[in-house]
């Protein structure tokens, strides 16, 4: 089964926009879980412009599914927060402080020493680790050398090319997933996945364990309601059965 982890940064942005608690982030997280999501993802940044560190602390106390914290480990405050809250998974992302959104993966060879040290720090506390990477075989080989448990494939390129040529858009990701599987790495994916492009991606990437989706899902919830939207994404992940033995795809709808 492919897990759906809902990134709630957009809800936190609205909640914190006026210094209050409307909408109530924790209650919305609980509802998302009740509607069937398998996990909650947060991406706290040092300036706390989306979700605050205190938000993360409160979520950890109360949610009943996996908590995935994303962020840049070169920020000491991020490392401290992760060690304090002890999430189920930490996803290391090479974004800068003022960056609007994540837009590239790690150069795992260049950053090998730093990443290995950081991953060991989290692993020693029992936290599953994941590295945000481009669909590049060399970077995936480098990721393996750091001791990380998983990679998260940065899917913006797939999403932007999907409508033009799905098979071409996904090719590099299939090659990357095959290499990761050969190396014993599990695979997560995220960035710009939505109801249109998610089923094809999920059907054609082997060993895919989790997708993290925030912007598109929260946007869809404005139109369809949160409960309906969460269920639409869960259905999107199950829309196709991918049979590795026969290489056949069967439409469930």
Model-derived segments and spans:
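Glycine-rich beta-to-alpha transition loops that act as phosphate-gripper elements at the mouths
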Residues: 50, 69-75, 131-137, 189-196
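Glycine-rich phosphate-binding active-site loops on the catalytic face of alpha/beta enzymes
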Residues: 92-99, 150-161, 208-226
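Histidine/lysine/aspartate-rich catalytic loop segments that bind and position anionic ligands
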Residues: 128-180
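Conserved N-terminal beta1-alpha1 strand-loop-helix module at the mouth
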Residues: 1-68, 73-74, 81-87, 142-145, ...
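C-terminal helical cap(s) of enzyme catalytic domains, especially alpha/beta-barrels
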Residues: 104, 165, 220-241
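Hydrophobic faces of well-ordered beta-strands that scaffold small-molecule active sites
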Residues: 2-8, 40-42, 67-71, 90-92, ...
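Alpha-helix-loop-beta-strand connector modules within alpha/beta enzyme cores
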Residues: 49-71, 110-127, 168-189, 233
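Catalytic cores of alpha/beta
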Residues: 75-84, 136-146, 193-208
């Amino acid at each position: 089964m492919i897990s759906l982890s809902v990134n709630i940064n957009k809800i936190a942005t609205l909640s914190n926009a006026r210094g209050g608690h409307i909408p109530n982030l924790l209650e919305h997280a609980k509802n998302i879980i009740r509607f069937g999501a398998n996990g909650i993802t947060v991406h706290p940044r040092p300036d706390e412009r989306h979700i605050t560190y205190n938000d993360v602390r409160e979520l950890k106390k109360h949610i009943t599914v996996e908590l995935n914290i994303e962020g840049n480990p070169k920020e000491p405050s991020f490392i401290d927060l992760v060690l304090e809250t002890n999430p189920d998974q930490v996803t290391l992302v090479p974004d800068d402080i003022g960056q609007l959104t994540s837009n590239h993966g790690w150069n795992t060879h260049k950053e090998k020493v730093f990443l290995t040290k950081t991953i060991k720090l989290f692993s020693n506390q029992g936290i599953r680790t994941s590295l945000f990477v481009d669909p590049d075989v060399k970077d995936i080989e480098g990721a393996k050398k750091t001791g990380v448990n998983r990679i998260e494939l940065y899917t913006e390129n797939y999403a932007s090319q999907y409508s033009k040529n799905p098979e071409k858009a996904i090719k590099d990701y299939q090659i990357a997933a095959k290499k990761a599987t050969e190396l014993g790495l599990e695979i997560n994916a995220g960035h710009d996945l939505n109801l249109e492009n998610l089923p094809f991606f999920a059907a054609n990437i082997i060993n895919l364990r989790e997708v993290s989706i925030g912007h598109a899902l929260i946007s869809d919830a404005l139109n369809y309601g949160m409960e309906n939207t969460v269920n639409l994404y869960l259905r999107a992940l199950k829309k196709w059965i991918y049979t590795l033995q026969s290489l056949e795809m069967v439409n469930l709808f």
